[in-house]
């Protein structure tokens, strides 16, 4: 039983597969059949009728016969073959020869594709032929008009073209021959060839028209404009030399020879080769070279104005610095009698004198070059600018040096004023310690006060010496100032601490009779207090009172601050 069921399942599967493949093949047959009908319905004959108004000779006749043969081949040979193969494919499918059926269908597809390509090619050639005829018919009149206009312009202005007239007229004759050839090809039905001929003449005419338009100007440039510019440049150069400008570095003779050779080259390529682009490029290069020379000449004029205007100013500035050098030198000697100058300060004066000598040499060198005939102003601009910069730098350095000299006296006065203030601070600090009735002054404060007195005295000694060494005096003064300020600050803190300790002990005395431990601690605090050990005294007293009455110390501090 199971065998029978299995067999039935296999048969059903085979039937289903056969049904599926046959259905797929039938669908492809229907598609190819529709394609075949579509090809047969294409309006090829109607499209071919579009050329009936053309002359049926030459290329037109050849194309028409070729198209008709190709269409007849498709209709009478390809399509019947396709029909026959479609029948074979259907028969193979009915007999379950699916592989054979598919091979036939592929062959049919190739035949229909080839037929489609042939039809598209025919339609494209028809369109090209008709379009060529239509465009040529429209454009030939424009070409004739442009030809006539070019011919008239050439004749009317023949004197402007010189030796090129015959060459241009020959080109026009060739274009006219091309127009005649176009007419002959059109008359012979060769519309494609005629189109190519017409386009070629259109390009030739456009090129020739540019020649006719551009050649007169280029010839005028070669024979009149540019030679005039060169002559003007030469005259301007000569005038500048007469005015005293040194222009040998420009090498104008060599440049003029180069310009003349380039001009001959431009005229040659224009007259013999009719190469407008090359001639224009050469003339453009000549113009750029001329402008470049003018820029050099203008630069020389500007350089001359700059050098000649600045040199007198620089000489005056230099002479003034020389005078100031002598004044500063004398001032330095005077200052040295009262003050001891550092090596760096003395070095600044020496450096100033050295740089001034160098500037003097540079100015002399430039003056010598100005007197020479071969040195151009443009070659001196940078040297003059460098001298100007150096003079400004020396002016600034010299002004700073003089300010430093003048500042020495100011520093001395400030130092003496600071000394007076420090002595006053020391006296006030000593009076504070004395009037505060403290048991004694801690050794470190006593040492600071003694050290401050020492540095103050050293500063006084330095200020009284001649020559005065302000650098060393300033160092002692700075040390004295630091020590005095620190001693004053710590003395004030000491007095405040002593008052606080006394208040804390006085507050703690309330509890002495009731608290033996507190009493002993306060005795120790008092002992330390009279031994000048105020820090430990405060710590012991504050700890004892705070233990007996928490918060009492802060309250005492607050009362004192109030």
Curated annotation (Swiss-Prot):
InterPro entries: EzrA. Disulfide bonds: none annotated. Residues 1-2 are extracellular. Keywords: Cell cycle, Cell division, Cell membrane, Coiled coil, Membrane, Septation, Transmembrane, Transmembrane helix. The chain crosses the membrane at residues 3-21. It holds the Pfam family EzrA. Residues 22-562 are cytoplasmic. Its main location: membrane. GO terms for biological process: division septum assembly; positive regulation of cell division; septin ring assembly. Disruption phenotype: Suppresses temperature-sensitive mutation in FtsZ, in a wild-type FtsZ background increases the number and alters the position of FtsZ rings. In minimal medium cells elongate and occasionally form minicells. Double dynA-ezrA mutants have longer cells with more double septa than either deletion alone. Mutant is hypersensitive to tetracycline. It is found in: Cell membrane; Membrane raft. GO terms for cellular component: membrane raft; plasma membrane; septin ring. Negative regulator of FtsZ ring formation; modulates the frequency and position of FtsZ ring formation. Inhibits FtsZ ring formation at polar sites. Interacts either with FtsZ or with one of its binding partners to promote depolymerization. This is Septation ring formation regulator EzrA. The gene is ezrA.
């Amino acid at each position: 039983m199971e065998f029978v069921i299995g067999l039935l399942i296999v048969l059903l599967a085979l039937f289903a597969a056969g049904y599926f493949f046959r259905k797929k093949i039938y669908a492809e047959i229907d598609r190819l059949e529709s394609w075949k009908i579509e090809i047969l319905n294409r309006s090829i004959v109607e499209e071919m009728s579009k050329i009936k108004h053309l002359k049926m000779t030459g290329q037109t006749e050849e194309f028409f016969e070729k198209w008709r043969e190709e269409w007849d081949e498709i209709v009478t040979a390809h399509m019947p073959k396709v029909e026959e193969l479609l029948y074979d494919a259907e028969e193979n499918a009915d007999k379950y020869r699916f592989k054979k059926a598919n091979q036939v269908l592929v062959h049919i597809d190739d035949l229909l594709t080839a037929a489609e390509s042939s039809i598209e090619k025919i339609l494209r050639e028809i369109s090209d032929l008709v379009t060529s005829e239509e465009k040529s018919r429209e454009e030939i009149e424009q070409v004739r008009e442009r030809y006539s206009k070019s011919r008239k312009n050439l004749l009317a202005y023949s004197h402007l073209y010189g030796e090129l007239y015959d060459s241009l007229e020959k080109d026009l004759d060739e274009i006219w021959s091309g127009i005649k050839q176009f007419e002959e090809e059109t008359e012979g039905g060769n519309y494609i060839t005629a189109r190519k001929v017409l386009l070629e003449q259109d390009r030739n005419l456009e090129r020739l028209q540019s020649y006719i338009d551009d050649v007169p100007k280029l010839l005028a440039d070669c024979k009149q404009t540019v030679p005039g510019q060169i002559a003007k440049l030469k005259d301007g150069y000569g005038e500048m030399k007469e005015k005293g400008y040194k222009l040998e570095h420009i090498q104008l003779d060599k440049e003029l020879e180069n310009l003349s050779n380039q001009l001959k080259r431009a005229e040659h390529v224009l007259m013999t080769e009719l190469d407008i682009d090359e001639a224009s490029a050469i003339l453009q290069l000549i113009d750029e070279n001329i402008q470049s020379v003018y820029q050099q000449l203008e630069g020389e004029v500007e350089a001359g104005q700059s050098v000649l205007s600045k040199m007198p100013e620089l000489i005056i500035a230099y002479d003034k610095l020389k005078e100031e050098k002598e004044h500063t030198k004398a001032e330095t000697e005077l200052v040295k009698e009262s003050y001891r100058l550092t090596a760096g300060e003395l070095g600044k004066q020496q450096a100033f004198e050295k740089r001034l000598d160098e500037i003097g040499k540079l100015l002399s060198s430039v003056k010598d070059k100005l007197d020479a005939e071969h040195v151009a102003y443009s070659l001196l601009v940078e040297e003059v600018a460098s001298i100007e910069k150096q003079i400004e730098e020396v002016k600034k350095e010299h002004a700073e040096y003089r300010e430093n000299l003048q500042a020495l006296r100011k520093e001395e006065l400030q130092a003496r004023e600071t000394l007076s203030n420090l002595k006053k601070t020391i006296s006030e600090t000593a009076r504070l310690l004395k009037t505060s009735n403290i048991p004694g002054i801690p050794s470190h404060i006593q040492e600071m006060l003694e050290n401050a007195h020492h540095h103050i005295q050293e500063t006084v000694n330095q200020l009284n010496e001649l020559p005065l060494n302000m650098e060393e005096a300033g160092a002692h003064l700075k040390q004295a100032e630091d020590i005095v300020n620190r001693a004053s600050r710590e003395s004030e803190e000491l007095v405040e601490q002593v008052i606080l300790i006394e208040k804390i002990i006085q507050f703690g005395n309330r509890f002495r009779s009731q608290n033996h431990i507190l009493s002993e601690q306060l005795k120790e605090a008092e002992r330390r207090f009279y031994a000048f050990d105020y820090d430990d005294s405060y710590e012991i007293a504050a700890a004892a009172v705070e233990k007996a009455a928490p918060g009492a110390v802060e309250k005492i501090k607050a009362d004192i601050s109030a």
